[in-house]
Regions:
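Acidic-leaning, charged glycine-interspersed low-complexity segments
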Residues: 85-129
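Short Gly/Pro-enriched loop/turn and capping motifs at secondary-structure junctions
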Residues: 53, 76-78
Length: 129
């Protein structure tokens, strides 16, 4: 079974519209390596799982799990954020993730704008028998 963050990475990296702004090699899972934390390498994306838990039980077996994902987008300009973020939101919505929180700030560590968005989805547990 693929981890939820891997599923999101695949969704984002295989989209041509998003790839025209963010090189798929600039989409990171969990952390951005220090060598890649460079303003000249922006825009970039980081995907983190915030929380997950099983739900919807039948006969004492979980049928689904709920997962919260955070996607951080770093850009050099506000215009880049305005162009890229709607693509991410649309892709997540098309894949049954509902956006429920966001924050926009200037990352003082690397002097880039950071758009952090949180998404939630309920996924079926794929039981292989």
């Amino acid at each position: 079974m693929m981890l939820p963050i891997q599923e999101v990475e695949m969704i984002l990296s295989k989209n041509d519209a998003l790839s025209s702004f963010v090189d798929p090699g600039r989409i990171f899972l969990v952390f951005v390596p220090e060598a890649d934390q460079d303003t000249e390498k922006a825009p970039m994306i980081r995907i983190n799982e915030l929380e997950s838990h099983r739900k919807d039980y039948a006969d004492d077996a979980a049928l689904t799990f709920e997962v919260d994902i955070q996607i951080d987008l770093w850009t050099k300009t506000l215009k880049e954020a305005q162009q890229i973020q709607p693509i991410i939101d649309d892709l997540m919505a098309k894949n049954d993730f509902q956006q429920y929180a966001s924050a926009f700030d200037r990352d003082p560590d690397i002097a880039l704008y950071r758009y952090a968005r949180r998404y939630r989805a309920t996924k079926m547990i794929d039981i292989q028998i």
